[in-house]
Regions:
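Divalent metal-binding pocket/active-site signature
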Residues: 76-79, 90-177
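Mid-domain alpha/beta scaffold segments of enzyme catalytic cores
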Residues: 1-118, 192, 241, 268, ...
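Short loop/turn segments at strand-loop or loop-helix junctions that form parts
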Residues: 33-38, 124-127, 225
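Structural detector of well-ordered beta-strand residues that form the stable sheet scaffold
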Residues: 32, 69-71, 123-125, 156, ...
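A general structural detector for well-ordered alpha-helical segments in enzyme core domains, enriched
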Residues: 18-22, 54-61, 84-88, 111, ...
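H/E-rich (His + Asp/Glu) clusters that bind or coordinate divalent metals
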Residues: 13, 156, 160-286
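Short, flexible/disordered intra-domain loops and linkers
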Residues: 38-52, 130-138, 167-170, 202, ...
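Active-site metal-binding loops of divalent metal-dependent hydrolases
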Residues: 6-7, 76, 126-128, 160, ...
Length: 286
């Protein structure tokens, strides 16, 4: 099982070896580690938040944790954002991370285009943003609709965009349709189902993803939102156990809402795909 969504936060950090021991205890053998955030997201006293230092930190950490991929957190509006993309790519990151905390997504278009040209994936936050600013409105799903025209970009929207889960599903429907019509000229959108949905909303959100009638089987990625500093084994197990039961229910009755005339859905292996099989395509390693 892989975990798409693991953060590096300020403060004490487990060694890569201890981190690996904890992830293995949770049944997680690999995934993504998202590097420390820039000052424009939050200034941390005593932390070196210069982009070069943050880049080296996530590369060094993942270098000691085989199976885990380094993702660089970039502010797409930084004056030297394109230089950051170039340098991070040359140094070997596996992808990029963006949270739109003070800007609308479209303002970073040039940076996203540069990332698309590298062939590396881009992970976005989506949904309510728990910080000290009124910033959630920057992260509603339809604010990302323009990405449909960023040729070659593979991107994910996190947390099922809670509380705008239905809006996210409708956005995926549009982008999925366009990608099927012109696969060489459009972007590819993935669901990052990392919690953000509280447990009481979780089953409904996952059922909407799979049972709306869209081709989602190969576009869903599972994560926890744990931190690499001290990976929470109990928390990761909780979400894996809950989600596995929900997935079993979906697989047992996949055609409940199938429209007459549509092909029957085969959701027999959706859990294995979301927790492992879909990762390689997201990374660009088909």
């Amino acid at each position: 099982m892989q975990d798409l969504h693991i953060h590096m936060f300020p403060g004490r950090m487990d060694t890569p070896d201890v981190f690996k021991q904890k992830t293995l205890a949770a049944g997680v053998t690999g995934g993504n580690v998202l590097g420390m955030y820039p000052e424009t997201f939050g200034k941390e006293e005593g932390e070196d938040q210069r982009w070069g230092a943050r880049l080296d930190a996530v590369l060094d950490f993942c270098g000691g944790a085989p199976g885990f991929q380094p993702f660089f957190w970039i502010d797409p509006l930084a004056e030297d954002a394109l230089e950051q993309v170039r340098c991070a790519t040359e140094k070997g990151v596996a992808g990029f991370k963006v949270i739109c905390n003070y800007f609308y997504p479209k303002e970073g278009l040039k940076t996203y285009q540069a990332i698309a040209e590298t062939g590396l994936p881009l992970m976005f936050h989506s949904g309510v943003l728990y910080n000290e600013q009124p910033s959630s409105g920057y992260n509603q799903p339809m604010s990302f609709e323009f990405l449909m025209d960023v040729k070659g970009l593979r991107f994910s929207l996190a947390h099922i965009s809670w509380p705008w889960c239905a809006e996210l599903v409708s956005l995926f429907g549009k982008l999925n349709y366009l990608d099927e019509c012109a696969p060489e000229g459009r972007s590819q959108m993935y669901y990052d189902i990392t919690p953000g949905t509280p447990p009481i909303f979780r089953e409904e959100a996952l059922r909407r993803i799979y049972m709306t009638g869209l081709r989602v089987k190969h576009r869903v990625l599972w994560g926890t939102d744990c931190i690499a500093n001290d990976y929470n084994v109990e928390y990761a197990r909780f979400w894996a156990d809950m989600d596995r039961k929900i997935y079993d229910g979906i697989s047992a009755d996949p055609n409940r809402y199938r429209v007459a005339g549509q092909d029957e859905y085969d959701y027999s292996n959706i859990w294995d795909l979301a927790t492992d099989g879909n990762f390689a395509a997201f990374y660009g390693k088909k």
